[in-house]
């Protein structure tokens, strides 16, 4: 009997960034929240993000609607 892998509906910030191929950065996630590109909820001390926002941000990056740039170790999210 084969077992199915259960994919969680919500992910941590680390899993979110890993899915996009980015390093886990608190400032990056705060900028995405400030620009209202992602919503989150808290469980204890953890911020959890719905998995659907990974696809949304990834599509916006591919379409050139947003850019993520670095300058001296800081990450910036720029909307076009």
Explain the meaning of each model-derived region:
Residues 52-80:
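A short, Lys/Arg-enriched interface patch at domain edges and termini
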Residues 1-28:
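Polyanion-binding surface elements
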Residues 3-4, 35, 40, 51-54, ...:
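Low-complexity, intrinsically disordered short peptide segments enriched in small/polar/basic residues
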Residues 1, 29-30, 60, 79:
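Detector for methionine-enriched segments
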Residues 19-51:
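Major-groove DNA-recognition helix of helix-turn-helix-type DNA-binding domains
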């Amino acid at each position: 009997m084969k077992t199915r892998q259960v994919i969680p509906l919500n992910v941590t910030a680390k899993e979110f960034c890993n899915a996009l191929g980015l390093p886990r950065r608190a400032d990056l996630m705060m900028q995405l929240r400030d620009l209202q590109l992602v919503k989150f909820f808290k469980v204890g001390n953890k911020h959890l993000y719905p998995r659907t926002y990974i696809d949304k941000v990834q599509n916006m990056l591919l379409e050139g609607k947003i850019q993520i740039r670095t300058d001296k170790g800081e990450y910036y999210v720029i909307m076009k």
